[in-house]
UniProtKB/Swiss-Prot annotation:
It comes from Parasynechococcus marenigrum (strain WH8102). Pathway: Lipid metabolism; malonyl-CoA biosynthesis; malonyl-CoA from acetyl-CoA: step 1/1. This is Acetyl-coenzyme A carboxylase carboxyl transferase subunit alpha. Keywords: ATP-binding, Cytoplasm, Fatty acid biosynthesis, Fatty acid metabolism, Lipid biosynthesis, Lipid metabolism, Nucleotide-binding, Transferase. The lineage of its organism: Bacteria, Bacillati, Cyanobacteriota, Cyanophyceae, Synechococcales. It catalyses: N(6)-carboxybiotinyl-L-lysyl-[protein] + acetyl-CoA = N(6)-biotinyl-L-lysyl-[protein] + malonyl-CoA. GO terms for cellular component: acetyl-CoA carboxylase complex. Acetyl-CoA carboxylase is a heterohexamer composed of biotin carboxyl carrier protein (AccB), biotin carboxylase (AccC) and two subunits each of ACCase subunit alpha (AccA) and ACCase subunit beta (AccD).
Amino acid sequence: MPRRPLLEFEKPLVELEQQIEQIRQLARDSEVDVSQQLHQLESLAARRRQEIFQGLTPAQKIQVARHPHRPSTLDFIQMFCDDWIELHGDRRGNDDQALVGGVGRLGDQPVLLIGHQKGRDTKENVARNFGMATPGGYRKAMRLMEHADRFRLPILSFIDTPGAYAGLQAEEQGQGEAIAVNLREMFRLRVPVIATVIGEGGSGGALGIGVADRLLMFEHSVYTVASPEACASILWRDAAKAPDAATALRITGVDLLELGVVDEVLEEPSGGNNWAPLEAGQTLRAALERHLGELLALSERELKEGRYRKFRAMGRFVEGNSQNPGKID
């Protein structure tokens, strides 16, 4: 059987994966040398996987971003932080497990790390609320960011959520206010802030920890104002049109880099981060260290002004002159 769950568009790989597993089992159970056959099959599977992933549609990228084995915030933190210490609570009686945070070191640099956290199975997903943070989660994140600002710790945030929790209790506790306060206060932070979309980046739930000097995004991650399913239901009253909505929303890294929303798209291993988590971790760490080195050279004023200009430029619409396309009205 395949080593891990395969997505619908990966089904052409099922037979190859089964053959690879059978040969591995044969090698374990006997002294027959099957290394050459195994290498050939693994090479063929890798080539086919690369061909499949080079032509993914936006709707298929969403499936990759939601893969249950995709590395999470805590997975990445454990990959490059040996001395991670998790901090808890919003000091208002809540400790949301859908949003985690703590202090650690990236190389020799002390940093604050915060991010959404999904579960691996149903039980853990229920405990983590499927990565959908409550107002307490965003207030916890803001408390930790204020702590980082006070002690001059750069902030690394990891975004992976379908959106902020929209339940009745969350609304009663001020979900909109909690996210709005985070947006306002993150613009005032005097330390470098780097946000990375490691999976789903959904709506205000993503933006609540996403006001950053640099916004990075993995190749098969998505970042969107609303889920394609929600968009399709609103516009066409038909969730089955989600693939059309995914294309129209321009949610992929290529689109968002072109629109100036993200600063860098990080390449993923063949088959996505779930196939080679350690390689993905090395890619992310190298990018974070590079961007952090550049930001640490800036003054507090330069950081805040640059962050403000970055977000003010988003969504700007300029109409061209039909008679003279090169002229701006």
